Design a protein with these regions (language model features):
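A broad, low-specificity signal marking well-ordered, structured residues that form hydrophobic/aromatic
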Residues: 141-143, 169-171, 193-195, 219, ...
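OB-fold/S1-family single-stranded nucleic acid-binding modules
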Residues: 222-257
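OB-fold (S1/OB) nucleic-acid-binding surfaces
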Residues: 107-117, 155-203
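Phosphorylation-prone, low-complexity intrinsically disordered regions
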Residues: 1-142, 157-167
Length: 258
């Protein structure tokens, strides 16, 4: 009987240790994220939270073509051709220091893991850090995508009785990577997702920054919230956290041609 009690105690200790490790990993992951591009990204690394795919953090090294030495007509982080650039490539690359460059296609792959890597398991008793999902990467990640089909101004319906409805707009986000635009007449499903941008009473919001922008602009969005696909749809929806978490890089050349 004493041996069975000892085995039971060891099992309890083992479970307690595993739960403590998960909590520490979750806390570490949360503390590794920035709220805006003006903040310095975490330089640490936790191998237990890295994906099995070969993903590296910036800054990245790109070989510029002879006729475009400063990448005025191409954004290599998104592999997207530009008609007009708003932010110099060197500045974009500086913002990518210790951050992951993520495409819509890659984000679909990450969320398909249900917030887990081979070693990292999300604590379901805690709110998900990235909305309805937790991207199993230590530190910041940046989504690159082209804004499309921006809606008219909308207002939220469900608000407290003493609060005014919140302004917002919806749009599509496209992955105009030349890998896809050179092959497909119509973009495949993993290259398209939705975005919601809401007005905020606490400082300048992504809505304020993007409301007057035209369709076809290439965006870089830092650590956005991710929402599950709506019923009857396979498309994910993301929402930027603030104006500081969004960069408008330029106007995509191939927008409207796919």
């Amino acid at each position: 009987q004493s041996s069975s009690l000892g085995a039971c105690a060891e099992n309890v200790q083992g479970r307690d240790y595993a739960q403590r490790v998960r909590r520490e990993s979750n806390d570490l992951l949360r503390s590794s994220r920035s709220s805006g591009f003006d903040q310095c990204a975490q330089t640490g690394r936790n191998e237990r939270l890295e994906l099995t795919e070969d993903m590296e953090r910036g800054p990245y090294t790109f070989e510029a073509p002879l006729d475009d030495a400063t990448f005025e007509r191409f954004e290599p982080h998104a592999r997207t051709k530009l008609r007009k650039r708003y932010i110099p490539h060197a500045s974009v690359n500086a913002h990518m220091n210790c951050r992951y460059a993520i495409s819509p296609s890659t984000l679909y792959s990450l969320t398909g893991r249900s917030g887990s890597s081979s070693e990292y398991v999300r604590d379901v008793s805690q709110p998900a850090m990235d909305g309805d999902f937790e991207v199993p990467l230590y530190g910041d990640w940046v989504l690159f995508a082209v804004m499309s089909e921006k809606s008219a101004l909308k207002y939220t319906n469900k608000t407290p009785s003493d609060a005014a409805p919140t302004k917002y707009f919806s749009c599509k986000l496209l992955d105009l990577n030349t890998q896809y635009t050179n092959i497909y007449h119509e973009l495949p499903g993993h290259c398209v997702m939705n975005m919601l941008a809401f007005e905020s009473t606490r400082g300048t919001s992504a809505f304020d920054k993007l409301w007057k922008e035209r369709d076809g602009v290439l965006l870089a969005i830092l650590n956005p919230r991710i929402m599950r696909a709506r019923k009857g749809s396979n498309e994910l929806t993301i929402s930027p956290r603030s104006a500081d978490s969004v960069l408008v890089l330029g106007l995509a050349e191939q927008y409207g041609r796919c």
